[in-house]
Amino acid sequence: TKKDVLPGEIFWSDEAELEIPKNHYLCFEITFSGSEIPFTPDKIVPAFSLDENGFKEDKEFPQPIFVGIRVSKSKKVVFIGDSITQGLGTTPDKYEFWAARLAERLGKNFSFWNLGLGCGHAYDAVTDGSWLKKAKTGDTVFVCFGVNDINMHRSVTGICNDTERIVYLLKSAGCKVILLSVPPFDMVGEDKKKWYAVNDFLRNTVSKNADGFFDVSDIIGKPSPRRHMSLYGPHPDG
């Protein structure tokens, strides 16, 4: 099968019926041609590229972002945010991916799509491009941005406006939105001040437009007045 893909286009393969024995792997081969093809290396699925010397382990090419199965009457839950949302560094040198753990606990009545992306920013998602369009396919969307926006020295107003707009775009698409506070990240100086200012706005203003609000620091932050610091180190997934 061959398909020409336009810039920014999202495409899906045709449905196929497969029977995979327990403890076996599904392998498939895809050929891309063109120039400046975007990709993200943040995946743990084994991936290989083929050249004149044979197959070699390689993540620097486009890979399927979603492999789904049809489940009747399941609620679709989406997580969008950065690497904290994605579930990297859950404990030292360990990637546990919260969406996968929740899927195991909640069973077949729920399906999860982990759209957390390393170094993700609110200003990326607010462009309403392919990333946010994927999130709009969910019934419930958890939104957690801010750490990378602050680390990139963006203004408090810019971060707050972008987050508020993201909530609006998702709600307009018919999604229920659960807004998360900016997680603790051991920030200092001006970044620390921005962390408190952004979280105050999210808690007191943006949360009123969402269907729920979860303050991450209640679970993984240190006691006040050090709520901006994580109990589990600088990448606070623990």
Where are these regions (language model features)?
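Class I S-adenosyl-L-methionine
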Residues: A103, K171, R203-S207
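Proline-centered loop/turn at the N-terminus of a beta-strand
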Residues: S111, K176-I178, G212
